[in-house]
């Protein structure tokens, strides 16, 4: 009974194993994990990132301490000759004569580091982020709190990079050169050893770090150049203080007579002149005698960096996945579509080609929407710079941009200071969110246009939109006729002109038509309301990053946080860094410093500690100033008159030497 028939016995040879473990022939042997095709393996540098960051953090702290020894606080200790060590300022935001390229580069480095922090698993690399192992044996650590600490860490790490430029000392330039080269060397070393990473996209880390490398490269070149200049000239570059070319250029441009363009030139080149005027109103072009404040320069630089970073993230997060899906389409997709009742063709290979073609069209729509979003955001940025310049010039002249009594006061307030501090950060966040919203809207619009209009017309199939229009054409024709007939009747029947004044006529017919067409106008109003919603959404999405424009009506403009921040930002900028006020304070301080030392050589620049003193010079309230106010006011008025008469170009032709020279007489 236990024996089996001979026919069921197999021939001698290698026995076949039908166990479950041998069913998957692609399973790696020996417990090895098979790397999926196209996936980038994890890359580890020869030197761990924790050591990199520990060295950079230590070097930054050392540089900050040395800078604190160089920068002395004379205000709190006026009797002490050497002063007390103080924390150096990273950026002089309200100093209009400082170099603007270094703060812009530092902020680009900081923002790019924060963008790389988002997908990073170790926000603080020099700390061990480990927790108790989970049930599957893998360690899991909460990353949210560490990422928040990472925000402060990278800001503190970039602090000495910016502070070395404001110290105005040869040793500070040497420290800045060392620190910038250390940062650049670490970044280049990491990207050279691990150009590909498995996060988001294999080249995302390399592409996202390009602004970071550009900013560090600029700093690593700028600091050595300033160091060489300081050794050659024996003066720290960038320490001119208030006496600089910008204030003088602003006053010169303000006092000189404006030249009027000839009408013949305009008529001869009418189209070119009109195009140039339109270009100047839409795109920012530098003009002599005016320089944008540092905060606006930082906002523009961060906006460009944010456009690049967000566009890169949207591009590498979507396009490679679409390409992988298109490359992996097989004939099985026909069964998947048939399950949803979609039959593209009886031929399975033709279905594969159609699906690949549709995926390619989807990729084209996505890239087109991204290009359109970036272009519109960049144009809005250029238009905003023109508006900033116009508003600042108006405020410099003493004009008011709105009728609100809150913004008429020139004095700073607590809310205004807070808005000034957060302006550049708000601008960057608005640009990022606005670009994301624009990408969604434009992608949906281009996809609907491609799949409902263009591709059905080209291929002659899937005419869903045209079939729906064919079935509902009486409805749309009725609405169109109602609109056209009312417009024609309003122009030819219900309106006539008497003595050059238009007047209503045929009022009975007008009342009857209004009553009878009310149901149709309700339907037309529904279509108009839909169009209004779409148009307002598109307009607000495009102008979301434009803080100088309120997205709310004028009566509710103060409820717009972006517009409110912008108005208070302008108040602080105009009240604290007016170029004319800066120039006059500089001249007064020079006269005050040269008064007790008549025989001494004139100074070419002011000490860095005298800038705040000059800002408060016109606002002194001591008893001696109150007693000598009439005499001081009279002397100040005479000095202003003399300065104007000497430096006004329009009055030079009326001087004695010029008149004698014109008459041919000897002076």
Curated annotation (Swiss-Prot):
Post-translational modification: Phosphorylated on tyrosine residues in response to RBP4 binding. Phosphorylation requires the presence of LRAT, suggesting it may be triggered by the uptake of retinol that is then metabolized within the cell to retinoids that function as signaling molecules.
Membrane topology recorded in Swiss-Prot or TrEMBL: Multi-pass membrane protein
Record-level GO BP terms: camera-type eye development; retinol transport; vitamin A import into cell
Transmembrane portions of the chain: 51-71, 99-119, 145-165, 169-189, 206-226, 296-316, 368-388, 423-443, 474-494
Location of region: Disordered: 1-22
Top-level taxon of the source organism: Eukaryota
InterPro entries for the chain: STRA6-like (IPR026612)
Alphabetical keyword list: Cell membrane, Glycoprotein, Membrane, Phosphoprotein, Receptor, Retinol-binding, Transmembrane, Transmembrane helix, Transport, Vitamin A
Extracellular face residues: 1-50, 120-144, 190-205, 317-367, 444-473
Glycosylation sites: 8
Localization: Cell membrane
Intramembrane bits: 510-547
Region listing for Interaction with RBP1, in residue ranges: 235-293
GO cellular component: plasma membrane
List of residues that carry Phosphotyrosine: 643
Stated role: Functions as a retinol transporter. Accepts all-trans retinol from the extracellular retinol-binding protein RBP4, facilitates retinol transport across the cell membrane, and then transfers retinol to the cytoplasmic retinol-binding protein RBP1. Retinol uptake is enhanced by LRAT, an enzyme that converts retinol to all-trans retinyl esters, the storage forms of vitamin A.
Assembly: Homodimer. Interacts with JAK2 and STAT5. Interacts (via extracellular domains) with RBP4. Interacts (via cytoplasmic domains) with RBP1.
Descriptive protein name: Receptor for retinol uptake STRA6
Organism, scientific name: Pongo abelii
């Amino acid at each position: 009974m236990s024996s089996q028939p001979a026919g069921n016995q197999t021939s001698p040879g290698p026995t076949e194993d039908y166990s479950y473990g041998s069913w998957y022939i692609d399973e790696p042997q020996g417990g090895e994990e098979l790397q999926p095709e196209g996936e980038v393996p994890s890359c580890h540098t020869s030197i761990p990132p924790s050591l990199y960051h520990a060295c950079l953090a230590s070097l930054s702290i050392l540089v900050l301490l040395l800078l604190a020894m160089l920068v002395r606080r004379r205000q709190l200790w006026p009797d002490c000759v050497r002063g007390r060590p103080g924390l150096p300022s990273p950026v002089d935001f309200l100093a209009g004569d400082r170099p603007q390229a270094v703060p812009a580069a530092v902020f680009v480095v900081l923002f790019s580091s924060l963008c790389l922090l988002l997908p990073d698993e170790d926000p603080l690399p020099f700390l061990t982020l480990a927790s108790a192992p989970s049930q599957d044996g893998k360690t899991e650590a909460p990353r949210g709190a560490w990422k928040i600490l990472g925000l402060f860490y990278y800001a503190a790490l970039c602090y000495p990079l910016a502070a070395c430029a404001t110290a105005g000392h040869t040793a500070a330039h040497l420290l800045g050169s060392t620190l910038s080269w250390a940062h650049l060397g670490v970044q280049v070393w990491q990207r050279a050893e691990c150009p590909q990473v498995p996060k988001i996209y294999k080249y995302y880390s390399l592409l996202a770090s390009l602004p970071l490398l550009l900013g560090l490269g600029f700093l690593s070149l700028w600091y050595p150049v300033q160091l060489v200049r300081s050794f050659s000239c024996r003066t720290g570059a960038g320490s001119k203080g208030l006496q600089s070319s910008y204030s003088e250029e602003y006053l010169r441009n303000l006092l000189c007579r404006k030249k009027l363009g000839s009408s013949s030139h305009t008529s001869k080149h009418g189209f070119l002149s009109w195009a140039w005027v339109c270009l100047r109103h839409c795109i920012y072009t530098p003009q002599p005698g005016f320089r944008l404040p540092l905060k606006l320069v930082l906002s523009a630089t961060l906006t460009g960096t944010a456009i690049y970073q967000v566009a890169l993230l949207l591009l590498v997060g979507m396009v490679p996945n679409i390409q992988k899906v298109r490359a992996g389409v097989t004939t099985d997709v026909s069964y998947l579509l048939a399950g949803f009742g979609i039959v593209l063709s009886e031929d399975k290979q033709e279905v594969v080609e159609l699906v690949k073609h549709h995926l390619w069209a989807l990729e084209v729509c996505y890239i087109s929407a991204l290009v359109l979003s970036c272009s519109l955001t960049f144009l809005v940025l250029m238009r905003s710079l023109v508006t900033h310049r116009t508003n600042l010039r108006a405020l410099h002249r003493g004009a008011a941009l709105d009728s609100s009594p809150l913004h008429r006061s020139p004095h700073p307030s607590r809310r205004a200071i807070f808005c000034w501090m957060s302006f550049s950060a708000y601008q960057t966040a608005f640009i990022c969110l606005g670009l994301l919203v624009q990408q969604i809207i434009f992608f949906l619009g281009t996809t609907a246009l491609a799949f409902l209009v263009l591709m059905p017309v080209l291929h002659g199939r899937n005419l869903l939109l045209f079939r729906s229009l064919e079935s509902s054409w009486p409805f749309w024709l009725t609405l169109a006729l109602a609109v056209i007939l009312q417009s024609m009747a309003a122009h030819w029947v219900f309106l006539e002109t008497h003595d050059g004044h238009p007047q209503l006529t045929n009022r009975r017919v007008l009342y009857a038509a209004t009553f009878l067409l009310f149901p149709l106008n309700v339907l037309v109003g529904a279509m108009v309301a839909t169009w209004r919603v779409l148009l307002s959404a598109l307009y607000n999405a495009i102008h979301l990053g434009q803080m100088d424009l309120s997205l709310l009506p004028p009566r509710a403009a103060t409820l717009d946080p972006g517009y409110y921040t912008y108005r208070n930002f302008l108040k602080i900028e105009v009240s604290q860094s007016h170029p004319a006020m800066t120039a006059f304070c500089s001249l007064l301080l020079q006269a005050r410093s040269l008064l007790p030392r008549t025989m001494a050589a004139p100074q070419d620049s002011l000490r860095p500690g005298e800038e705040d003193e000059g800002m408060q010079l016109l606002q002194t309230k001591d008893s001696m100033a109150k007693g000598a106010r009439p005499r001081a006011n009279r002397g100040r008025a005479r000095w202003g008159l003399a300065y104007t008469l000497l430096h006004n170009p329009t009055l030079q032709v009326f001087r004695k030497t010029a008149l004698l020279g014109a008459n041919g007489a000897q002076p």
